[in-house]
Amino acid sequence: MFSLRRLLLAATLFLGAMLLFAQSAEAAKGPKITHKVYFDIEQGDKPLGRIVMGLYGKTVPKTAENFRALATGEKGFGYEGSTFHRVIKQFMIQGGDFTKGDGTGGKSIYGDKFPDENFKLKHSKKGLLSMANAGKDTNGSQFFITTVITSWLDGKHVVFGEVLEGYDVVEKIENTKTGPRDAPAEPIKIAKSGELEVPPEGLEGQSEWASPAYANEDEKPAAPVPVTDAKPPAHDSIPAATADDDDTGAPLFAKVLFFGVLVLGLVLYIRLRRAPKGTYGKGME
């Protein structure tokens, strides 16, 4: 039979373990991948390989559909033949300007620009797809693929997918020699792009939620996307990190609660060890 001391200690450890398990389970449930698209990449006359990307069509349906349709070219325009015009090592690779090729052009399937859909997902790992912009609600066709965690972009750029296969090709692009304006010295082109078979139901991405509440949020039908015909700003770009930017990962409340449980367990253990023998009465030891 457990003594009271052992029972209290076991209960404390059990609560801590359950909290840790709950956090891990929540983190493991990522956004659903609804579509797969690909880019066949060339540099000069040399094939670099294929990048296969999964899109989060349940979480950001408008943004994912924009990228999917531009990858297939079904609207009469799209990514095929365009270049990666901006490459910054240990940050990201940027492309999608199929009208001017220098970061000042591009357009969405909804019109010139469309609003930020939501910021439910964080830039929590390398290999994530996110929209390049020139400020709030200025999404067009330009996108970037992260090559490191870029938490300072959370809440400013819309994450909508991830690299499923061919991250080695992303690394080849990232490590290419660049010149002025971070443009590759030798152009890197999307020679071919298109859509692949829809992945099995239940396939989940690896991007983390900005809030755990989003993981179980019921998906609602997408509202019509407002179209803006204003002239595009000078550049769709992505800001570099600043010293004040930080990403703590798990929600603060969960961290405090977990720490509190551990401290409580330690305090109980110390007090019970110091208690005089027989404190709990006969039959309890």
Curated annotation (Swiss-Prot):
Residues 217-243 are annotated as: Disordered. Residues 1-27 form the signal peptide. One of its GO terms (cellular component) is endoplasmic reticulum. Pfam families: Pro_isomerase. Keywords: Endoplasmic reticulum, Glycoprotein, Isomerase, Membrane, Rotamase, Signal, Transmembrane, Transmembrane helix. Residues 38-195 form the PPIase cyclophilin-type domain. GO terms for biological process: protein folding. This is Peptidyl-prolyl cis-trans isomerase B.
